[in-house]
């Protein structure tokens, strides 16, 4: 499963398979704005993450709390609720996600699940825009792997909070315009997730408490010391 976040955000040349971003549920659920970088109908669709980068693919982990078939009598369509320390991911799989569908049918809550998938937005009857995940690769993981993901997702979130205005100024400007803030709040979200990791009675992480506490201090410091400078503006193509 590809999990690295190391990828340039600028330019219009897009690889066939982009690297997955580590994103907490709290941030992904706010990433309701989609865009393309090309008029080509086959161009990838991105969500603008509130922390200021684009994402065509994400890597998430959490506890499965519910698996429900919301399809028709003759066609399965599974909706899976996956919870991380910050919120809920909704994963949907049907006939076009055949391998993921087979695996999801075997899931027994409350197993820990890793998902690499594409974010998709949809509008509800009342006009609310929600975000879900279309899975490309999934797998059951142990609690240690889940804990390491929480730590890594916090690290990646803090990197975006600190550097997105420099490394991806165009998307950072777009995100600020769409969501009305610069994403610095998610440093506090990262801190909350790390504190949850420290407090968890069931935690079996290979990370020692001192390492987690150091990252927690960094998260709290970033949350309290954020540059309010306006990012550079850009026009991108709405999906």
Label every PLM stretch briefly.
Residues 1-50, 54, 192-239:
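OB/S1-fold single-stranded nucleic-acid-binding modules
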Residues 44, 93-103:
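Short acidic (Asp/Glu) patches
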Residues 55-74:
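Structural detector for short beta-strands of small beta-barrel domains
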Residues 55-57, 75-77, 112, 128:
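A general secondary-structure signal for short beta-strands and their flanking turns/coil
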Residues 60, 78-80, 115:
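Hydrophobic residues positioned within well-ordered beta-strands of beta-sheet architectures
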Residues 63, 118-119:
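Short, surface-exposed secondary-structure boundary micro-motifs
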Residues 69-97, 137, 141:
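OB-fold (S1/OB) nucleic-acid-binding surfaces
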Residues 98-99, 106-112, 118, 124-217, ...:
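Extended, charge-rich, solvent-exposed interface segments
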């Amino acid at each position: 499963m590809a999990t690295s976040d190391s990828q340039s955000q600028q330019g219009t040349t897009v690889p066939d398979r982009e690297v997955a971003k580590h994103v907490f549920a709290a941030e992904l659920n706010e990433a309701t704005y989609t865009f393309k970088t090309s008029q080509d109908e086959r161009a990838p669709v991105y969500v603008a993450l509130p922390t200021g980068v684009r994402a065509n693919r994400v890597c998430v982990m959490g506890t499965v709390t519910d698996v429900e078939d919301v399809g028709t009598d003759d066609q399965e369509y599974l909706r899976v609720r996956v919870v991380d320390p910050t919120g809920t991911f909704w994963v949907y799989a049907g006939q076009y996600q055949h391998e993921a569908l087979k695996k999801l049918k075997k899931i027994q809550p409350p197993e820990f699940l890793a998902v690499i998938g594409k974010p998709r937005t949809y509008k509800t009857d009342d006009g609310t825009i929600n975000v879900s995940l279309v899975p490309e690769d999934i797998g059951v993981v142990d609690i240690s792997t889940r804990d390491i993901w929480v730590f890594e997702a916090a690290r990646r979130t803090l990197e975006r909070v600190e550097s997105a205005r420099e490394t991806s100024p165009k998307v950072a400007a777009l995100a600020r315009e769409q969501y009305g803030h610069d994403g610095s709040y998610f440093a506090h979200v990262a801190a909350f997730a790390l504190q949850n990791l420290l407090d968890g009675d069931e935690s079996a992480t290979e990370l020692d408490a001192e390492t987690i506490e150091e990252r927690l201090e960094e998260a709290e410091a970033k949350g309290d010391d954020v540059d309010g400078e306006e990012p550079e503006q850009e026009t991108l193509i709405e999906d």
